[in-house]
Amino acid sequence: METTVSLVQMLDARERRVQHQQELLAQYHKPLICFTMNICGPIKDSPLIRRGFARGRQLLRQQFLRAKLTPLYQDAVREVTGCEAFYVLDADPLTIKKFTTDIEDATPLGRLFDMDVIRPDGLKVDREELKLEGRRCLICGGPAKVCSSRRIHTVAELQEKTTEILTEARDAQDIADAARLAVRALLYEVTTTPKPGLVDRRNSGSHKDMNVFTFMDSAAALYPYFEDCARTGRETAEQPAPETFAALRPLGCEAEGEMLDATGGVNTHKGAVFSVGIVCAALGRLDRSLWAEAARVLAEVSAMTAGLTEKDFVGVTAENAATVGQKLYIQYGITGVRGQVEAGLPTVLNVGLPVLEEGLAKGYDFDRASGGALLAILANSTDTNIIARSSRERQLALTEELKALLAQTPYPDKDALAALDDRFIAENLSPGGSADLLALTWLLHFVTTEGNIDE
């Protein structure tokens, strides 16, 4: 809820801020960064403003890492009078001022950052000491002091521009993060080793035309597509969810072409183009605060794909079924990945994600936790790739065998997984559908544990 603040409240907040600065300088005798937001008008705090503030703090943390600096003290307050952050650093004040001005000047969002650097004696470091010009106006780009003192622009104009800057920065960060986490998930899936019958660091599984590097090439090529999916979700967020899904389909066709270009014609990620692209679009549709809730993200996936199975299989008969998916649907009622996304990826939410996160919590390395999640997914879903490479009977028998194995050892070790890999290769089995669900499991893990930001 946005609250209008009075001049008295702002003056009181300024007095408290100065007092806190003096206390920190007296305690540490080191330079201090005081970070606030330049927000015009009587509303100084909102979810959008907090997102901008969180991005500013993130950029400061990155500069600290780059300079190998660990703050001696840091804290942040978020009040109706605005957001404030304080950092005490053991470094030269001019060095600190250099990287804070770099942040302020690098992007439009930086124009809303006020990162004061205060020396141990209480004096501020001026931009002029670095031979830098003064801050620029949000509206016209002229000297900010001139525009402010002469009131050249109205409060309404400044508020509109501020909202535009904050919104564009928020959306750009969300879109980039969704795509980054999607590619990261694909890389974690392919590098999980050993995996039965699948490409990994050990071998190419039951495949003759691809290896782990083929998958890396493909994953890298798909980053722009995942950005497009998240952007489409954000741009259509106010429309009915199925409209977002409809807008994805031409993007998916183009992405398949990029994948084939990158791999020399090898189908490495066709399933992921479909399913991971949908999840990226769902993330785009949702406010960032909801990313931490896996069930909410997957509910959006379900809403986007409502009625998909019926639409895609309408008119399909035993006589005209052409694809493996169509034939399995007619013969066994298996809905495959369409049924998974339409139901909100229940195998990911109820099997893959809990098993993966429990394994990581137990201290297992990524390979073992991820391998356990893969087997759990395979044992609790219908992998159409297994059926296509063998039979429905073999797939059913395999799931029962894996359930028995996991009942005794939920997280088989490397030797057990390698032995299973050898068996799958001997039978030419490859659970590609389960591999896609494992990638989605990693994506939801990343989104829920790392996707949320400090607001």
What kind of feature is each model-predicted range?
Residues 1-67, 78, 98, 102-171:
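Long, contiguous binding/interaction regions
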Residues 32-92, 211-237:
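Short, well-structured hydrophobic secondary-structure segments
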Residues 45-46, 93-100, 291-296:
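Short, conserved charged micro-motifs
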Residues 164-241, 245, 283-422, 449, ...:
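Phosphate-rich cofactor/ligand-interacting catalytic cores and adjacent structured alpha/beta frameworks
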Residues 228-284:
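Long, hydrophobic/aromatic-enriched structural stretches that serve as scaffold segments
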Residues 257-270, 362, 422-431:
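A short glycine/serine-rich beta->alpha loop
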Residues 275, 371-378, 437-444:
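Short, structured motif recognition centered on aromatic/hydrophobic residues
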Residues 426, 430-453:
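Short, amphipathic C-terminal "tail helix"
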